[in-house]
C-alpha cells in the first residue's frame, strides 16, 4: 500500500520478444473498508479509512474498488494466487478464482524476506501470503492502452511491488502499469531432494518465483481489458534481479504467448564453470 516515490527516468536495454483454477475462499458479505491516501506530489499521505460502495471492476479474483489520485486510477492488492502456505508451499502457484469476493487492501503483504541480507530471526520480515498485484492507469475512460508489467529487483531475496510509484510513467506515457509480488529467497528459489525427488510435473521446479510471475501474467491476459488495457500489447520490464527474471521469462515455455515485448534493466545471466557443471551431473 505504501507508495514510496515517483520514478523519474529509465535507462532501458530493450529486447523484443514475439511470442496456461482452482480454490474459492469464503465469500465476504460485509461492505469492505478501504484505506484512503491523499496525493502529495511525490508521496501519498494516509487520510483514514471508510466503507465505500463505489466503482468496482469485476475480475476473476473478485470485485476491486477503483481509487483515484491526481491524474491516475489505481487498484491495489489484487490476489492472483492462493496463499502458498501449507500444502501449497514449494509448489507451483494456484490461481485465486472467486468472482463474488470483495477485494480489500491488505497491509504488509510483501513476500517473506531477509532484512540486511542476514539469516537471523530478528531480520525476517514479510508474509508467505503475498501473491498480490497492483494496477496503475491514466485517469479517464480509454481502451486498449499498452500494458507494462513490472518485475522488481532485489537479488530474488528482497523487494516488493510497492517500492516504486509509477504514477508519472502512467500519466506521461499513457500506459497501464501492473506490479506483482513474487516469492523470494528459499521460498521462491530452492533446490532440495525433498522437492525434486517427491514432487511431480511443474512442482519439481526450483523457480517458484518465476512461476508466480507466469501466473500473474496469465491474470493480466484474462483481466486487463476491464481496466482499459490491451492484452495483445504487454511489455514485461524489470531491474537487476527483475531484469534477470525478464530474461528467464523470455526462455520459459510456460510464459510463451503471455507477453509481446521485454525490457531488461541491469539484467544479467549466470553461468557455471565446467567443473561445477560436471559436479551437478554427478
Question: What spans do the regions from the language model cover?
Answer:
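Positively charged n-region of N-terminal signal peptides that target proteins for export
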Residues: 1-7
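Cleavable N-terminal signal peptides of Sec/SRP-targeted secreted and luminal proteins
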Residues: 7-23
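Alpha/beta-hydrolase fold nucleophile elbow
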Residues: 227-239
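Non-catalytic accessory segments of hydrolases
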Residues: 2, 23-210, 231
Amino acid at each position: 500500500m505504501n507508495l514510496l516515490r515517483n520514478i523519474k527516468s529509465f535507462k532501458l536495454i530493450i529486447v523484443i520478444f514475439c511470442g496456461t483454477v482452482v480454490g474459492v475462499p469464503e465469500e465476504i458479505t460485509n461492505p469492505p473498508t478501504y484505506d484512503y491516501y491523499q496525493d502529495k506530489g511525490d508521496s501519498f499521505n494516509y487520510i483514514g479509512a471508510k466503507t465505500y460502495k463505489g466503482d468496482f471492476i469485476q475480475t476473476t479474483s473478485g470485485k476491486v474498488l477503483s481509487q483515484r489520485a491526481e491524474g491516475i486510477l489505481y487498484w491495489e492488492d489484487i490476489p492472483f494466487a492462493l496463499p502458498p502456505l501449507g500444502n501449497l508451499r514449494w509448489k507451483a502457484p494456484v490461481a485465486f478464482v472467486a468472482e463474488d469476493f470483495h477485494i480489500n487492501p491488505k497491509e504488509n503483504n510483501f513476500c517473506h524476506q531477509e532484512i540486511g541480507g542476514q539469516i537471523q530471526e530478528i531480520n525476517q520480515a514479510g508474509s508467505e501470503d503475498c501473491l498480490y498485484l497492483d494496477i496503475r492507469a491514466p485517469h479517464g475512460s480509454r481502451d486498449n492502452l499498452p500494458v507494462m508489467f513490472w518485475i522488481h529487483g532485489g537479488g530474488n531475496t528482497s523487494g516488493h511491488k510497492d517500492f516504486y510509484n509509477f504514477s508519472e510513467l502512467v500519466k506521461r506515457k499513457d500506459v497501464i502499469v501492473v506490479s506483482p509480488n513474487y516469492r523470494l529467497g528459499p521460498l521462491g528459489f530452492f533446490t532440495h531432494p525433498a522437492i525434486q525427488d517427491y514432487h511431480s510435473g511443474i512442482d519439481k521446479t526450483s523457480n517458484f518465483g518465476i512461476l508466480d510471475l507466469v501466473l500473474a501474467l496469465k491474470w493480466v491476459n484474462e483481466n486487463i481489458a476491464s481496466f482499459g488495457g490491451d492484452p495483445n500489447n504487454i511489455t514485461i520490464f524489470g531491474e537487476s534481479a527483475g531484469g534477470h527474471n525478464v530474461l528467464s521469462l523470455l526462455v520459459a515455455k510456460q510464459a510463451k504467448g503471455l507477453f509481446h515485448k521485454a525490457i531488461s534493466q541491469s539484467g544479467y545471466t549466470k553461468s557455471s564453470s565446467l567443473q561445477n557443471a560436471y559436479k551437478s551431473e554427478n
